[in-house]
Amino acid sequence: MRHYKTLRYYETVFAVKPTLSEEEMKKKFEQVKEFIKQKGGEILYEEDWGMRQLAYPIQKFNNARYFLVQFKTENPQLPNELDFQLKIDEDVIRWLNFQIKESEVKKNAQ
């Protein structure tokens, strides 16, 4: 039986603690993008949503800095590995990974 790799598209949104410095927040964003690339993903779109008010306190924080990354990969383990990486990162207070359709990928303004 042959196993074919399927190209899939994903979106990840994550929130970091507001107590981090601007430099630390940007570094965290770069680390997540680099992790995706190292695991065989290709970044298609990225966006810094900035500081946002939370609907309810999370770890006693009322706001957090949000980031969005859309990527594609043939590595079926990448979403789970990214989920685990975000889970163990103490600076990340919330995250969400989900599969999207190719037509839902936003275009970076070049």
Swiss-Prot record:
Gene Ontology molecular function: small ribosomal subunit rRNA binding; structural constituent of ribosome
Gene3D superfamilies given in the database record: 3.30.70.60
Domain of life per record: Bacteria
Coiled-coil positions: none
GO cellular component: cytoplasm; ribonucleoprotein complex; ribosome
GO biological process, one term: translation
Swiss-Prot/TrEMBL keywords: Ribonucleoprotein, Ribosomal protein, RNA-binding, rRNA-binding
UniProt keyword NAD, yes or no: no
Keyword presence, Ribosomal protein: yes
Family: Belongs to the bacterial ribosomal protein bS6 family.
Function: Binds together with bS18 to 16S ribosomal RNA.
Protein name per its UniProtKB record: Small ribosomal subunit protein bS6
